């Protein structure tokens, strides 16, 4: 898998234009969703390389990250004369960078892509690392590929277009990055007050978070080992997210991950000795900012069944990434159903559900 370049921009338009000018391509396409077109595209639409570029606009929302939308992208690329020498720019949040990346990976067996994330979630997670995919059969990112973009351009000015819920969604991944990396990173993440929104401090945290993911992906690009650290909070988190879709009450990915972090820290404490003091600190922080996820014991079997479809599983065994301490990651941890259900109890008790 080729190495990707990540640029934390000081002047997005100038840096992006310079990069595009250095490339040879026959046609450039821009993929975005309805939200991005309204709030973000006006910030970059006057870039010279974007003039006359066909624009592909998808309906916003993760429920649209499926095969129907993917086929629409393929059809548009085909109808507009895209070739293997074309370039697809994915301007948007995780839904766009995931699906656009997969469209790029598969159209004519692969065309080059560039990611310009416009959400916090995409900036620190979805757009970086080369994972692409779509939801399928009610499961998150069930079909996809490892296909890194040529470059990821991160401009934190886009974050000012986001509402609080979307900031929270992305910040859950930053909490995860703090927990799996170092005490220094963890402490800085825990200090951020989301309600006061110091964008300058947030920008520095974004750079720190991206560096954590870049380091891990460079070491293990195809998730054979340590890259599984990035799945912390996601085994249960993805189950929460999938359950919300089944109930037709979809929640943002990061809100599900935050809940997954709470449950998986409980498992980390019980099975790996993660310190209770730090567990309590993280639970307090997440309770302070994140809405509670409402579910009860009648949902447990469904949640467990959803976990059995997790991509990290091997031989029918649910594999977790757990922590012995901040920065001390234990991958490929098998957990009994009893303990998993206990962790769901712990979440509900912590949030008074």
From Swiss-Prot:
CDD domains, alphabetized:
DHQS
Q: Which Pfam families match?
A: DHQ_synthase, DHQS_C
Positions that bind Zn(2+):
173, 234, 253
Q: Which reaction equations make up its catalytic activity?
A: 7-phospho-2-dehydro-3-deoxy-D-arabino-heptonate = 3-dehydroquinate + phosphate
This protein's pathway = Metabolic intermediate biosynthesis; chorismate biosynthesis; chorismate from D-erythrose 4-phosphate and phosphoenolpyruvate: step 2/7
Query: Could you say which cofactors this protein requires?
Result: NAD(+); Co(2+); Zn(2+)
A cellular component term from Gene Ontology for this protein is: cytoplasm
Q: Which cysteines are joined by disulfide bonds?
A: none
Q: What class of enzyme is it?
A: lyase
Where mainly located? cytoplasm
Which InterPro entries does this UniProt record tie to the protein? Dehydroquinate_synthase, DHQ_synth_AroB, DHQ_synth_fam, DHQS/DOIS_N, DHQS_C
Q: Which GO terms describe its molecular function?
A: 3-dehydroquinate synthase activity; metal ion binding; nucleotide binding
Query: What keywords tag this UniProt record?
Result: Amino-acid biosynthesis, Aromatic amino acid biosynthesis, Cobalt, Cytoplasm, Lyase, Metal-binding, NAD, Nucleotide-binding, Zinc
Q: How is the cofactor bound?
A: Binds 1 divalent metal cation per subunit. Can use either Co(2+) or Zn(2+).
Which SUPFAM superfamilies would you find in this protein's record? Answer: Dehydroquinate synthase-like
EC id: 4.2.3.4
What is any one GO biological process for this UniProt entry?
Answer: aromatic amino acid family biosynthetic process
Report residues binding NAD(+).
Answer: 60-65, 94-98, 118-119, 131, 140
* Localization annotation: Cytoplasm
Q: Member of which family? A: Belongs to the sugar phosphate cyclases superfamily. Dehydroquinate synthase family.
User: NCBIfam families, from UniProt?
Assistant: aroB
Free-text function comment from the UniProt entry = Catalyzes the conversion of 3-deoxy-D-arabino-heptulosonate 7-phosphate (DAHP) to dehydroquinate (DHQ).
Entry protein name:
3-dehydroquinate synthase
User: Can you name the source organism?
Assistant: Parabacteroides distasonis (strain ATCC 8503 / DSM 20701 / CIP 104284 / JCM 5825 / NCTC 11152)
Q: Which gene encodes it?
A: aroB
